[in-house]
Design a protein with these regions (language model features):
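Hydrophobic/aromatic-enriched cytosolic interaction surfaces used to assemble or bind macromolecules
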Residues: 1-251
Length: 251
């Protein structure tokens, strides 16, 4: 068995162009990836175009922390063919976009009538990213989030706006806990407001090598060093699979 884990480039954010809001479009052209023989050991890693990605028996795509929204609901009792429509009805007021523009996916082992988490992603964007990989003969078996609501809490510090050939321009904190997931810049007061003080003692803290110094200064305590490739592999071990409903893998 061989596993290829691919990082989908973060979705372009809204930005101002001549006073108007615009969103850059088009799938990413280069991907960070890792390979593993068993999902545990990191074998190789790198960056390349889709057509140059290593071949593997299983392909897992990972979405960036900020590209997945999270909603806590009671799962409606609906037959499989109508479940997606039922979810859209429940979440209509909570979603920032029209329900038809959002891809929804249920948490593993979700049960009707019970509280569960629903992941929300831009449908057009995700469909375009999967299509770009498929065009290069890279067929994704599972799509997973980089982080998801969980206990105990996880705090991960990483560089932002980084050019691989140059320095990072800032540090972000990705905070996953029982009530959701948030990504905020370390600079300013929002990160302090987000994390309880003191943080739960069981919180698992980590940072990329380039963010360790800032993370430890902010926390006042050591953190585990976790390279981006290690975090990709960790995400791939989750039970989540966002390829549901109309984006389910066709075999």
């Amino acid at each position: 068995m061989s596993i290829l884990v691919v990082q989908i480039p973060p979705r372009p954010r809204l930005h101002s162009v001549g006073g108007a809001q615009a969103e850059a479009a088009g799938p990413g052209t280069e991907y960070a990836y890792v390979t593993s023989p068993d999902g545990l050991a990191l074998e190789t890693q790198g960056h390349c175009a889709a057509a140059l990605l290593p071949k593997a028996t299983t392909v897992i795509a990972v979405l960036a922390d900020a590209d997945v929204g999270w909603h806590r609901i009671v799962l409606p009792k609906a037959p499989g063919a109508r479940l997606r429509a039922a979810l859209g009805g429940v979440l209509e007021e909570a979603l920032l976009e029209d329900t038809d523009d959002v891809h929804l996916a249920l948490a593993p082992n979700a049960s009707a009538g019970q509280p569960t988490w629903v992941a929300a992603v831009s449908r057009r964007w995700l469909r375009g990213e999967l299509a770009a990989l498929e065009k290069a003969d890279v067929f994704v078996d599972r799509v997973v989030p980089m982080a998801w609501p969980d206990e105990p809490p996880i705090g991960h510090f990483a560089e932002t706006e980084r050019d691989r050939s140059g320095p990072a321009h800032g540090i972000a904190l990705h905070w996953a806990h029982a009530d959701g997931v948030a990504s905020v810049r370390l600079q300013g007061g929002l990160a302090r407001a987000l994390v309880p003080s003191p943080a739960p003692p069981e919180t698992r803290w980590s940072a990329t090598p380039g963010a360790v110094a800032a993370a430890e200064q902010w926390l006042g305590a050591p953190v585990r060093v976790m390279a981006p490739g290690q975090r990709l592999l960790q995400a791939a071990r989750s039970l989540w699979n966002l390829r549901q409903f109309d984006l389910a893998r066709r075999t």
